[in-house]
Every structure is written in structure tokens, then in C-alpha cells.
Amino acid sequence: MAFPTPAQLTEILQPVAAARGLDIEDVKTTRAGKKSQVIIRIDGDERPSSDLIEELSQEISEIFDAQEEAGTLNFGAGYTLEVSTPGVDFPLSASRHWRRNQGRLVGYALAEEPGTTRVARIGALSEDEESVALITMVKKEVRYQIERLENLSRAVVEIEFAQPSAVELEAAMQTFDFAEQNSATRED
């Protein structure tokens, strides 16, 4: 039996994570003799606690061990299992990532301007979760921009060292409908 692929492991892990209200965000495997690694990134609408991650890690380890014993998985001579949350440098590639980071600053590129990085605060998602409100401050004035998620690339949460203004945070917490009614066209 070959070393398991990330897709195979994701299929095994999905029900375990879903039972706890979590999503499998990423699975990476590295086969390196006695130093093989399985790295699993999980997240949820409520950030998982370290206790929950520890419990999940133990359960995953037991599942992998049982499947190795049954001959359905083969990690080779041994492996290191790492279970954690994605971290701030994880790309925002699904609507749930945008929803979970509402109010945070994001660096992103528009599909038609791939070489240009823009920065905005993440607002609400549309009801169908296909568009997001992006908030910028221009001369102390709030500007709403509505973008379809499919038109955004290289989106990553920006680390902030200063507290954003109350006005900007309040704008980020407005409903999508409010943001859409008050949005500027891109030519503004």
C-alpha cells in the first residue's frame, strides 16, 4: 500500500472534524523515511481551543493507527502528526475564510490587476456568500467596495499593530445590504 495522499486523508478526517463543527482546511504529507509528517490544518466558525485540538489530534492518531493495523493506510516506518489551526498567513480561498475574518484587514489582488496588492477591511458576505464588502478609509471617510470572491486572489489577513478606528470597525460590521447600498463604483 502506498503512502496516503492528502485527498485520502481528508476523506477519512472530514467526518471526524464535522462532528465537532470544524473544517479540514489543509492536509500535507511528507514522506521522508523515519521522519514522515502528516500536517493537518483545521478551523471552525468558533476558533478551536487548544484542548479541542489536543482531543482531535488524539482521535486522529487512533484512527490512523487502527487503519494502519487494518492495512488500509501505510505511513511507513513512522510519522509525526501535527494538528493545528491555519495561522494568519493561510490564504483566504473559501467564503468561510472571509466570513470568519470579518473585521480584519486583508491584502488581496483583483483578478484583472494581478500585480497590484490592495488592502481593505473585510466586511459582511452576501447572503449567497459569493461577494464580500471591503472597507477602506479615504480622508476619514468610509468607502465600501463590493467584490465577487471569484475576482479576488492572493488574499491573506494582514497583521495589525495598531487598533483600527471605531468608525472603521463599525463599518466592517454592517450588513452586506447596507454596504452594497453605500458602495462606490470602482471608478470612484
Curated annotation (Swiss-Prot):
One BP term from GO:
translation
InterPro entries cross-referenced by the UniProt entry: Ribosome_maturation_RimP, RimP_N, RimP_N_sf
GO CC, sorted alphabetically, is: cytosol
Q: Which UniProt keywords apply?
A: Cytoplasm, Ribosome biogenesis
Query: Where, per UniProt, does this protein localize?
Result: Cytoplasm
A matching Pfam family: RimP_N
Principal localization reads: cytoplasm
Q: Which HAMAP family match?
A: RimP
Name the protein family.
Belongs to the RimP family.
Q: Which NCBIfam families match?
A: PRK00092.2-2
**Record PANTHER family:** RIBOSOME MATURATION FACTOR RIMP
Q: What does this protein do?
A: Required for maturation of 30S ribosomal subunits.
Which protein are we looking at?
Answer: Ribosome maturation factor RimP
The source organism is Corynebacterium aurimucosum (strain ATCC 700975 / DSM 44827 / CIP 107346 / CN-1)
What's the source species' lineage? Bacteria, Bacillati, Actinomycetota, Actinomycetes, Mycobacteriales
